[in-house]
Amino acid sequence: LAQGINKYSKRKMEHDILISLGSNHDANNNMQHAHEALRRKFVDASFSRVLSTEPIGIAGPNFLNCLCRVHSSLPLQEIIAMTKLMETTLGDSREKRQKGCIAIDIDILRYDDLRLHPSDWQRPYIPQLLADLSEE
């Protein structure tokens, strides 16, 4: 029994993480590359379907959006840094964003019970995509 307790206590806590992805520039290609990048970092990555949505708060073409659920023992700040690096690697930049061109936007919506990006939770497509992930 003591051996089992020791073994259990050495396991790192896996955090339940919900990630949103969006793109309105070369969207199919950028979403595919973002999916691949997330799968390389998180072997258990599961994705919702991809929805086309009208832009909210910016002028520009429609977006492709989806959600991704992963588990990791990494702290929140490391996950955020990783996703921001993915954005840059996939061609996103502040200059392009100012022109309404979003190559890829990768945001952490939830880290365990902590909700981030409160306005994103109000977007009508989020519940639809969440339902996809809960049906798995």
Please identify what each model-predicted range represents.
Residues 46-49, 110:
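Structural signal for conserved beta-strand scaffold positions within catalytic alpha/beta enzyme cores
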Residues 24, 47, 68, 129:
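A residue-level signal for conserved active-site and pocket-lining positions in enzyme catalytic cores
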Residues 14-41, 48-54:
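N-terminal beta1-alpha1 ligand-phosphate binding loop
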Residues 28-30, 74-81:
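Short, conserved charged micro-motifs
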Residues 55-64, 77-136:
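Flexible, gly/pro- and Lys/Arg-enriched active-site loops
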Residues 21-23, 68-74, 110-113:
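Short beta-strand-to-loop capping motifs
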Residues 13-14, 104:
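Residue-level preference for short coil/turn positions at secondary-structure junctions
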Residues 1-12:
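N-terminal amphipathic/basic-hydrophobic helices that include classical n-h-c signal peptides
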